[in-house]
Amino acid sequence: MFQKNSSDGYSSVLPGIELKTLVYGEKTLMTEFLLEKGRQLPKHSHPHEQTGYLVKGHIRLTIGAEMFDVMPGDSWCIPGDLEHSAEIVEDSVAIEVFSPVRADYLPE
């Protein structure tokens, strides 16, 4: 599968948090998140392993009991079923990959 860059395809996950599925295959799904300064991703978990890379901005990411100040170029891996949350310190862009594929993030 090949996906051309486009400004279309974003959907609101929460106020100030936009998601776009970039590409997906049989085992992984890649997303782009646009994150607005001052917003929170509440503590949650899911069965998917989640790896990410911060393209721009600044977020505070809590994975389990550990908190990380995430800056551009930093990356992370969150095992499936582990609680995590994020505070958006500056307007940010993050790329995240989920495995297995998250059916709720597939384009309609």
For each predicted feature, which ranges?
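A short, N-terminal "cap"/entry segment at the start of jelly-roll beta-barrel domains
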Residues: 1-27, 107
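Conserved short histidine dyad/triad with adjacent acidic residue
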Residues: 31-45
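Glycine- and acidic-residue-biased ligand/ion/polar-headgroup-sensing regions
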Residues: 48-59, 64
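A cytosolic small-molecule/anion-sensing beta-strand core signal
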Residues: 55-56, 71-72, 90
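Structural motif
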Residues: 58-60, 67, 83, 92-93
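Short acidic-glycine-tyrosine-enriched beta hairpin
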Residues: 65-80
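Ligand-binding loop in jelly-roll beta-barrel domains
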Residues: 80-104
